């Protein structure tokens, strides 16, 4: 169970160093292949809430990439209605076994803070983001206030 050993080590590192933008990490010690936590973005329009994500690691980790799902709804061109995310670092063709979970999380936070309309999962939102940023930000902020999780205060 090489995956479990590596994940235990990575989890300890993340908890020891702390990540400002990834909080409330929950992992069942009996099953290290599923992590949950809160993404806490810095940039508007997403800084009005937090977003629960789930990271599912395959048994073949680190030789196969983890899968990330947003459990909190988000108005974002790179994240679809089912919570699936288009994140190049964890795509099968780009994945490298040396990539660590904290790097994946940092990439995810960067994507949430700075949408990439050229790689959309939701073409309508990418178009709105590109053509009418003000309208997009207003809609995304309202959506975040309505569906987002409460941000940790500490």
Swiss-Prot record:
The active site is at residue 86. One of its GO terms (molecular function) is ligase activity. Pfam families: UQ_con. Gene3D superfamilies: Ubiquitin Conjugating Enzyme. The keyword Membrane does not apply. It catalyses: S-ubiquitinyl-[E1 ubiquitin-activating enzyme]-L-cysteine + [E2 ubiquitin-conjugating enzyme]-L-cysteine = [E1 ubiquitin-activating enzyme]-L-cysteine + S-ubiquitinyl-[E2 ubiquitin-conjugating enzyme]-L-cysteine. GO terms for biological process: protein K11-linked ubiquitination; ubiquitin-dependent protein catabolic process. Its EC number is 2.3.2.23. GO terms for cellular component: nucleus. Residues 2-149 form the UBC core domain. InterPro entries: Ub_conjugating_enzyme, UBQ-conjugat_E2_core, UBQ-conjugating_AS, UBQ-conjugating_enzyme/RWD. It comes from the Eukaryota. It is an enzyme of class 2 (transferase). Pathway: Protein modification; protein ubiquitination. Keywords: ATP-binding, Ligase, Nucleotide-binding, Transferase, Ubl conjugation pathway. The keyword Transferase applies. PANTHER family: UBIQUITIN-CONJUGATING ENZYME E2. Catalyzes the covalent attachment of ubiquitin to other proteins. Belongs to the ubiquitin-conjugating enzyme family. This is Ubiquitin-conjugating enzyme E2 L5. It comes from Homo sapiens (Human). The lineage of its organism: Eukaryota, Metazoa, Chordata, Craniata, Vertebrata.
């Amino acid at each position: 169970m090489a995956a479990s050993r590596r994940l235990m080590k990575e989890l300890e590192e993340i908890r020891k160093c702390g990540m400002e933008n990834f909080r409330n990490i929950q992992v069942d010690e009996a099953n290290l292949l599923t992590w949950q936590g809160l993404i806490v973005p810095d940039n508007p329009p997403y800084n009005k809430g937090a977003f629960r994500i789930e990271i599912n690691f395959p048994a073949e980790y680190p030789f196969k990439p983890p899968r990330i799902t947003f459990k909190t709804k988000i108005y974002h061109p790179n994240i679809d209605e089912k919570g699936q995310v288009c994140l190049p670092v964890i795509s099968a063709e780009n994945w490298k076994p040396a990539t660590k979970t904290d790097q994946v999380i940092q990439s995810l936070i960067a994507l949430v803070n700075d949408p990439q309309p050229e790689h959309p999962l939701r073409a309508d939102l990418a178009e709105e983001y590109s053509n009418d940023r003000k309208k997009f930000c207003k809609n995304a902020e309202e959506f975040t206030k309505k569906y987002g999780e409460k941000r940790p205060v500490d």
